[in-house]
Amino acid sequence: SGIGPELVSKLICEEITNEANIIIIGERNILDQGNKISGKSQNLKYVETFDQIKFEDGNKFFLDISKGKNHKYKIAECSEESGKSVLESLNLALDLAKENKIDAINFGPFNKTSMKMGGNRHSDELHLMAEKLNVKNFFCEFNVVDNFWTARVTSHIPISEVPNHIKKANIIKPIKLINDAMILNGIKNPRVAVQALNPHAEFGIEEKNEIIPAIEEVKKEGINADGPLPCDTSFITAFKNKNHDCIVGMYHDALQSGLKAFGFDRGVTVQGGLPLPITTPAHGTAFDIAGKNKANLEPTLQSFKIALTMAQNKSKQ
């Protein structure tokens, strides 16, 4: 219902997609809608089951889940039907991942309201994916702008609860996870900046008792970590001045506000800690420009490139 169909329509026409075996999962009429908006067309083979897919001569496949039904979805409008369609396509992709039939997932922007209307009971798609893939280890969301990565110790919790979670073990987990993910994306020996919790990294006890010990421990394991950096200057030090390759922060807004200020229109989300690379553009469904062929392809293209690189490198391990 948003800008997703036109973005997928444009992405499939990009030359870099020829470097992978492409399977698009969704309803055919939705892609047709996207093509009508974008003015693009593709040479796709349409199938109704995965078993019908045979990759040869650079073919790209569309796995049609419509089951012969021609559903109509209103542009820029949330609905139970569109939410169900998104959940069905996502769950099918995750099933294929569990069966080791695919190597990565790159999805367009989701509308959380429609997904909830369609039956999603999870707070976000990451937790849905983790449950579906039976993930028991630590997982978290990475955000990427211009190949600069971020991860956080806490995410969608009240700010009043954040200090309770700032523990050495909790800080080590995202540091290790983002370090491994960036190496998989081709960044050797990533320079990891770790944010403080308190103003100027000194008005509190968390830096001394938890954050610094966490940094010291990961450094012993060979991770190139640095900090704690004061939140208010961390993005200038790490991102703008190019002194680091990523930042690990203690809470949501300390990271998101800085990253979005530098590149909200170029952001990519990587789902960290899952058994295969899963990426998406960081923006939403943008109902205000849906259907107008104004959607910027760059975040979607970058998210595809990251998924492709990580999958290629993972296959070499």
Annotate the PLM regions.
Residues 1-317:
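Anion-binding alpha/beta catalytic cores of soluble intermediary-metabolism enzymes, centered on
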